[in-house]
Amino acid sequence: MKTIIKTNYFSRVFLYGLIFSLCIFPLSAKARQTSSKKDLCIVIDPGHGGIQSGTQRGTVEEKTLNLKIAQYLKEALEKYKGVTVSLTRDGDYDVSLTDRTQYSVDKNADLMVSIHNNATGDCAAYDSGCTVLAAKDGYKQELADEEQKLACNILNELSALGIENQGILLRDSEANEKYENGELADYYAIIRGGVLKDIPTVLVEHAFVDDDSDFENYLSSDAKLKVLAEADAKGIARYYQLTTEDGKKAESPLENYKEKIVHIVDGNSKHNKISYKTYYPSSKKETEENSSNTDTATTKAEKQEQTTEKSAPEAKTDVGLESESQEKSSEESSNTSENTSSKSVTKP
């Protein structure tokens, strides 16, 4: 009898200790979603809003396009079982970059998807097509792998619509801001915030507002914006292996898949590092190959002319919204635009 009592006592001690440890030590983002919550919680972030119009084309403002895509994406994702979807904004008003990430924290989000559209600029050598921003390799590598693999699935679905796939974009801090391990932090605040808060976060640039072909084919009507959103949803569903309410399971996620990586180091496209990374199942390690120190992408004009030796007009991922300096200034003054390269803000 004494032996039985002692065994029960130690069993209770072990059980209490296990429960305590699970409460104290946080799980990874994906483990947290599958182990302690029923639903996959996704926060969709429509870029810009309020006085922050983003890029413009005549009377068309990026902030409006972003919100419509986000609303359609929410609608598409809610067709899947076990998914809860929220928006950081549901109208035309400004939300600070810090508040966007904090909203995801408050929602205990498993994923944050920031919705944007692009404009020609000077940090990447292309002026049309889609790209997805994600965390850099190195610091919190597991999180970076998760974001980049999700990005592959989203890009695959967008390119299936005919949009040119410009790959995954990574960018170094230009203010020498560093993570705890001493590595340069991510440049874009929405990506950096996700890293610091352990929330997988990607930013999708769907198409170029100032490119005639991109705009006409993908952004010129609500119906076309809905198609973009449904492609985003399909990519997310593939990665997380979601099932619709009527029992239809998403296609298997991409595996052994090679994707282009554009790594911006200083905002000058001539210094960009281009590589191709193969993404394997989780049991294998990702590999990078064919690295170069020059962004060799060309614009459509260059492809047509083939006679000029000048550098290509380069594209700025509109997400100047997400830069570290702009994040600070947007919080200091509500009159400061999140995207300093965009055209003058006009009322809708």
Model-derived segments and their meaning:
Residues 7-30:
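Sec-dependent N-terminal signal peptides of Gram-positive bacterial secreted proteins and lipoproteins
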Residues 31-103, 107-109, 122, 126-129, ...:
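Active-site histidine-acidic residue metal-binding/catalytic motifs
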Residues 43, 114-122, 171-281:
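Active-site-adjacent mobile loop/cap segments within catalytic or ligand-binding domains
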Residues 62-65, 69, 73, 97-100, ...:
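Stable alpha-helical elements in mature extracytoplasmic
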Residues 71-82, 105-109, 117, 146, ...:
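Sec-exported extracytoplasmic/periplasmic mature domains
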Residues 147-186:
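Active-site-adjacent substrate-binding region
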